[in-house]
Structures are given as structure tokens and as C-alpha cells.
């Protein structure tokens, strides 16, 4: 947090005077580069997800979107969403001195450049991607408070327009109303849900 050009904020940090807010937390994972492309997926920022996989291999599915940054593009939508989260009044900016591990981080970076040169080579983004008609970002309110199910309602409206629905999520935890919505949708169309197996999922209660 004390490094040049780096600013870190905690979203809705713990406040013991408001214990009912302890479970209001972020679970978004995305990286935006130069306002033109982004990676969005389910990886946490730890060695298990982004490490060298020497002891255990962890496989996640990510989406790479390359955009021209036009006014209605999804990268603009994602950037606006980030700014709305970043500016929440409960957030706290982290201040402190540079870590003693900064040198080790630089050494790690140089090691990666030497051992994984392909990761640092220029990329042909057009060759690596496929054209799509539209990409839209859907999300709930960024406020750390009880929310109405806006995102679920939007997903249900989208699923109602299709004949064959594939829903992919790392784990699925529904309340009674959501199970009712899925049952209603499945009565008129094919609905398939792809999720982790209990043996491999990090949240067994939400896995198949």
C-alpha cells in the first residue's frame, strides 16, 4: 500500500459496533488493463490459485474480453462498477511502509521473466479471442447492506427467453424462492447447471 502508484482499500472493514455487517464482503475477481481488456473469473489472489502449482494444481475458468473501449462496451461497464465499489464510504485506505518482502517480489518477477518468456511476449489479442455480438456485465448494488435480488431477477428474465439454459457456477446456494424459480424455468425449457463436485469444491454445501 506504500508503493509508488499503488493504492489499496479495504471494502467495508470489520466494525465491532456493527456486527450485523460482518458478512458483507466482496467476492469479485477481475483485472482491467488499460481500459481495453479484462480478465474475469473465480481465482482468489493466493498461491493456490496463481502460484507455480508445484504441489497442487488448481484449475479455474476465466474469461478474457478484449474491447475497443467504446462507450457501451463491457469494459466500460466493469470500470464503472469498480469505481462505484472503490468509492463506497465505508471503505478504508491502507497506509503503511513498504514491506521487507519487496525485494523477494522483484526476484520472483525476474525469475518469471527468465523461466516463462512466453508470458511476457507480445500477444495477438485478435488471434487469441473470438468475436461476439455483445458482452454485458450484471451485478447487484455495491452497497454493504441487505440487497434486493436484482441480479437473480435479471438472470431469470434472461433464462425465460431461452429454450436451452446452461448455468455455470463454482457452487450453488439457493433459498426456497430461488429453487421455485428454477423449477418453474425447468418446466418449460431444458435447464442444466454445471458446478463443482463435493470432492473438489471449496464450499461442499454448495456443490453437487
Question: PLM features: residue spans?
Answer:
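Charged, low-complexity intrinsically disordered terminal segments
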Residues: 1-28, 33-208
Amino acid at each position: 500500500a506504500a508503493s509508488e502508484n499503488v493504492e489499496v482499500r479495504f471494502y467495508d472493514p470489520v466494525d465491532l459496533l456493527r456486527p450485523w455487517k460482518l458478512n458483507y464482503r466482496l467476492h469479485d475477481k477481475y483485472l482491467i488493463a488499460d481500459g481495453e481488456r479484462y480478465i474475469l473469473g473465480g481465482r482468489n489472489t493466493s498461491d493456490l490459485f496463481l502460484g507455480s502449482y508445484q504441489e497442487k494444481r488448481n484449475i479455474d475458468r476465466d474469461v478474457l474480453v478484449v474491447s475497443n473501449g467504446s462507450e457501451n462496451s463491457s469494459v466500460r461497464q466493469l470500470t464503472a462498477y469498480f469505481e462505484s465499489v472503490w468509492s463506497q464510504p465505508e471503505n478504508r485506505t491502507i497506509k503503511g511502509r513498504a514491506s521487507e518482502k519487496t525485494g523477494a517480489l522483484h526476484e520472483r518477477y525476474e525469475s518469471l521473466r527468465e523461466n516463462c518468456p512466453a508470458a511476457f511476449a507480445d500477444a495477438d489479442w485478435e488471434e487469441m479471442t473470438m468475436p461476439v455480438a455483445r458482452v454485458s456485465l450484471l451485478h447487484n448494488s455495491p452497497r454493504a447492506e441487505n440487497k434486493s435480488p436484482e441480479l437473480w431477477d435479471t438472470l431469470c428474465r434472461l433464462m425465460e427467453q431461452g429454450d436451452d439454459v446452461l448455468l455455470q457456477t463454482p457452487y450453488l446456494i439457493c433459498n426456497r424462492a430461488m429453487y421455485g424459480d428454477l423449477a418453474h424455468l425447468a418446466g418449460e425449457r431444458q435447464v442444466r447447471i454445471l458446478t463443482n463436485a463435493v470432492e473438489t469444491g471449496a464450499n461442499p454445501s454448495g456443490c453437487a
